[in-house]
Amino acid sequence: EALLKAGALQTAIFNSANFSSIATDAKGVMQIFNVGAERMLGYAAADVVNKITPADISDPEELIARAKALSAELCTSIAPGFEALVFKASRGIEDIYELTYIRKDGSRFPAVVSVTALRDAQNVIIGYLLIGTDNTARKQAEEALLKAGALQRAIFNSANFSSIATDAKGVIQIFNGGAERMLGYAAADVVNKITPAD
């Protein structure tokens, strides 16, 4: 009974609509494409299983860049394509990375992908499991924070008041645009260099 429950739990986790679960054979051809992958990518499993690799639904420019970066990092030649997606996992190295997936309709979205090599009893790789999550909301939140920070800096630096802040020793750490205009010093000339008394 415990094994049946464990099997049911594994099935429920694997079929979660919140994660794309893509299992491939050793050559990278998709063998399993779960409900979450169907929802995120717009393909039916029948459209991709035994037909394409995860590289075919990934941004080709990112695959080239990833292959170059991994080749430099690991001092070996790594081909763009599926090999770039699974190279670390094939060597037993934990691999979680950001990647742009391409949906069936051609639209793109950022994903965080975790890759694991699947091995048989003799420790021979028989395939790979790629678990992905849609990273769109986090990316949008990061962009909103960057824009908010830029807006705050713009307001702070265009203010008609001077704002000067020092550290515990009295050395200037903040010197805004208003202070530059009123006092005639550039921030670069005073920050981390002098105290207001100087």
Predicted regions and their residues:
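PAS-associated C-terminal cap
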Residues: 1-7, 121-124, 133-149
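Active-site-proximal helix/loop capping residues that flank conserved catalytic or ligand/cofactor
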Residues: 1, 15, 55-56, 83, ...
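PAS/LOV-family and closely related PAS-like sensory domains
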Residues: 18-130, 164-198
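Intrinsically disordered, low-complexity segments enriched in polar/charged residues with Gly/Pro
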Residues: 1, 8-11, 85-88, 104-105, ...
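PAS-family sensory domains
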Residues: 5-20, 39, 144-158
